[in-house]
């Protein structure tokens, strides 16, 4: 039933829902009237009209005496080479095709400021490569790959020198000879009608009749990318994402960069696609695409935006946007067995209790761990332990790199309760050490090293100045000489302390698994 207001009224739409408001109402009034999804401090898109827009996009047309070729740049995969292309592409005009082979076509030479490598790389059909012939930037050529092959092109290491893909004119590529000439190279101009919109964070902004508001982005996850989807769930645990990078074709979210994932579903990066970079530089980054882009093996498809592309279009670097997923994450870890049972029943999921099966036991592991797999199988195993067996820890903000490593090592980045495996425990030694991961700990520089006494319950990590980098330890008594991993103070990064359950640490044996929960600082 609509509210009846005295005086002048206006109509606005909030996420497509029309609402009647008194004249002079604000964005906040509209949100409260509709109960629209919104996390305080995030961006709201306010649309007031439309206009015509003309702009260049990441597609270039190469006109030759035989025909035209369309290439699409890959700015997120090879930003440095793409920047160099934008600087030099006009120099190709009036140049002859330099050479052709069954595997490639070359255009050039050009002069660049890139650094060559001497590595051999494998290339796929339709990839466009910036080659430094003779390992000299003064003899740079643009290579179009006609078939899969391997070669030493003296390319920059960035993305094997691949900075674009051929998206049109493949017959022209096959017909080109050394007698052909490049007539022109120019960016493709896109013309379209776009909305007149504004990015709003001040909820006291007054509205006008006919305004539209968009408050959140809804994502439909892909069942074929369970690991990548769970990674995304971890990023949006508090219901919002911060934009760390903005380009014409996408916005990027880098809060969990550095975490590699297995290749999963690879598909075209159409407008609204949400992807995860699965390997290489920038692994763990998530992207939402504003424009269509070709598929690439380095990007897993997380899902697609089904509502709120208006926010994606207007969001800039540093902005935060409200995000919802449908279906949402299924996470029973940190619940009691009974809470997990009731929670799973709402999804129609069968619970199989393991470990301590009492109603008040705490779930520390769920199997399968990933939401998409749970939904597919229709059941999940929940491993319970006694609540007093869980260690409660508090991490120190003075050691951000070491705390990040600890969260990754234990799994606390992905779940509310993580785990550690005991590496060394001996009665009377008053110290317990846990297995680390040298590959994850690589580059763990000294930070927050102790200066005086290390107190009982303090947690430390061996830094890169020592052989056993990444080892985690806990002191069971005060010590003014060595850290929790038995290293001198300058080889130890202090990351926090145990705030609950330290009496259980003294009972641990080598090979035991201990479960940890992070206590957030008030």
From Swiss-Prot:
InterPro entries named among the record's database cross-references: Methan_mark_3
Family: Belongs to the UPF0288 family.
NCBIfam families: methan_mark_3 (TIGR03268)
Protein's UniProt name: UPF0288 protein MTH_1865
Species in which this protein is naturally found: Methanothermobacter thermautotrophicus (strain ATCC 29096 / DSM 1053 / JCM 10044 / NBRC 100330 / Delta H) (Methanobacterium thermoautotrophicum)
């Amino acid at each position: 039933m609509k509210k009846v207001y005295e005086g002048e009224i206006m109509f606005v739409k909030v996420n497509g829902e029309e609402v009647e408001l008194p004249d002079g109402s604000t964005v906040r009034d509209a949100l409260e009237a509709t109960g629209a999804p919104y996390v305080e401090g995030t961006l709201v898109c306010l649309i007031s009209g439309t206009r015509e827009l003309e702009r260049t996009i990441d597609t270039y047309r190469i006109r030759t005496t035989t025909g035209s070729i369309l290439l699409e740049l890959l700015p997120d995969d090879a930003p440095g080479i793409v920047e160099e292309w934008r600087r030099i592409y006009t120099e190709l005009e009036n140049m002859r095709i330099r050479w052709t082979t069954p595997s490639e076509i070359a255009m050039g030479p050009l002069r660049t400021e890139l650094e060559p490598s001497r590595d051999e790389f494998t290339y796929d059909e339709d990839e466009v490569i910036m080659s430094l012939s003779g390992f000299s930037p003064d003899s740079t050529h643009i290579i179009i790959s006609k078939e899969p092959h391997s070669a030493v092109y003296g390319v920059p290491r960035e993305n094997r020198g691949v900075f674009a893909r051929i998206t049109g004119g493949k017959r022209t590529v096959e017909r080109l000879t050394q007698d052909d000439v490049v007539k022109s190279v120019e960016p493709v101009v896109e013309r379209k009608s776009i909305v007149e919109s504004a990015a709003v964070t001040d909820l006291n902004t007054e509205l006008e009749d006919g305004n539209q508001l968009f408050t959140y982005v809804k994502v439909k996850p892909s069942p074929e990318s369970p690991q990548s989807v769970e990674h995304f769930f971890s990023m949006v645990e508090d219901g919002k994402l911060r934009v760390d990078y903005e380009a014409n074709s996408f916005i990027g979210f880098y809060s969990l960069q550095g975490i590699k994932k297995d290749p999963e579903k690879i598909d075209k990066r159409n407008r609204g696609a949400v992807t995860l970079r699965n390997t290489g530089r920038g692994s763990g980054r998530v992207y939402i695409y504003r424009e269509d882009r070709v598929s690439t093996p380095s990007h897993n498809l997380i899902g697609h935006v089904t509502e709120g592309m208006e926010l994606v279009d207007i969001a800039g670097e540093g902005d935060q946007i409200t995000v919802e997923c449908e279906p949402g994450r299924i996470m029973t870890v940190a619940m009691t067995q009974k809470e997990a049972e009731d929670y799973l029943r709402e999804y129609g999921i069968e619970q199989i209790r393991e470990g301590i099966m009492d109603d008040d036991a705490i779930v520390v592991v769920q199997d399968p761990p990933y939401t998409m797999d749970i939904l597919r199988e229709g059941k999940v195993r929940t491993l319970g332990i006694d609540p007093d067996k869980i260690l409660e820890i508090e991490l120190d903000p003075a050691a951000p790199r070491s705390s990040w490593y600890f969260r990754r090592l234990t799994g606390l980045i992905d779940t509310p309760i993580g785990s550690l495996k005991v590496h060394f425990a001996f009665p009377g030694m008053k110290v317990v050490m846990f297995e680390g991961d040298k590959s994850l700990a690589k580059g763990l520089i000294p930070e927050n090293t102790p200066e005086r006494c290390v107190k009982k319950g303090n947690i430390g990590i061996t830094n890169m100045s020592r052989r056993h980098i990444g080892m985690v330890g806990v002191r069971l008594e005060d010590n003014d000489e060595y850290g929790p991993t038995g290293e001198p103070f300058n080889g130890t990064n202090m990351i926090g302390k145990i705030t609950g359950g330290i009496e259980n640490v003294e009972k641990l044996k080598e090979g035991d698994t201990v479960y940890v929960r992070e206590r957030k600082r008030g």
